[in-house]
Amino acid sequence: MLKQIVSAASLVLALTASSVGFAQTAPDELVRKNTGDILTAIKADKDLAAGDQKKIEKLAEEKVLPYFNFMHMTQLAVGRNWKDASDDQKKALIEQFRTLLVRTYSTSLSQFRNQTVDVKPLKLSATDTDVIVKTIIAQPGGQPIPIDYSMEKLPEGWKVFDVLIDGVSLVTNYRSSFNTEIKANGIDGLVKSLSDRNAKNSAKK
């Protein structure tokens, strides 16, 4: 289930990215305006289309990840254990979780070709500081996938802090496995587990 959630989330989160800052564009309009940019880039570059992991990872780093609030995502994924973590542990958790998502999203991006995204209109007021943008991914030969993603308004603009695929939260799914690891081996154990997983993924390149 988690793999399916991450794969589906990758498309929507990728399609939100552009050189236009979140502060200048409403969240739903940002998604609507830039739908297809990443898919176009993949189709136009034979290396990307062939699944070149390094190039796809670079694409994700440049076009997608600047628009995530990784600190908030990590805090939500770690849950109640976050308050028990030291500053150094929090920094390590954010770094390792970010690396995990970078590589997971990069792998998933290489699988997208002909999907389309329908972005539902959002009623946004001037005082809103967090919103949920609802979208539907249509995939040839497959069932449409409803995706809601939570965004918050920060001084630097709108950023993503959670994604719900067919009602299931990406952050909540990670929280379950993170809590299991922390119960068994503590926060340092979770950091090591994430670090080991990232090292293993890196070795597969």
Where are these regions (language model features)?
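Surface-exposed, charged secondary-structure patches
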Residues: 103-145, 197-205
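Sec/Tat signal peptide C-region and signal peptidase I cleavage site
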Residues: 19-23
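Low-complexity, intrinsically disordered terminal/linker segments enriched in charged
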Residues: 162-205
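Short beta-strand edge/turn micro-motifs at domain boundaries
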Residues: 144-172
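Bacterial N-terminal signal peptides that target proteins for export
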Residues: 1-9
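Solvent-exposed loop/turn segments at secondary-structure junctions
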Residues: 82, 99-100, 124, 139, ...
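Bacterial N-terminal signal peptides
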Residues: 8-18
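Early exported N-terminus immediately downstream of N-terminal targeting peptides
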Residues: 25-105
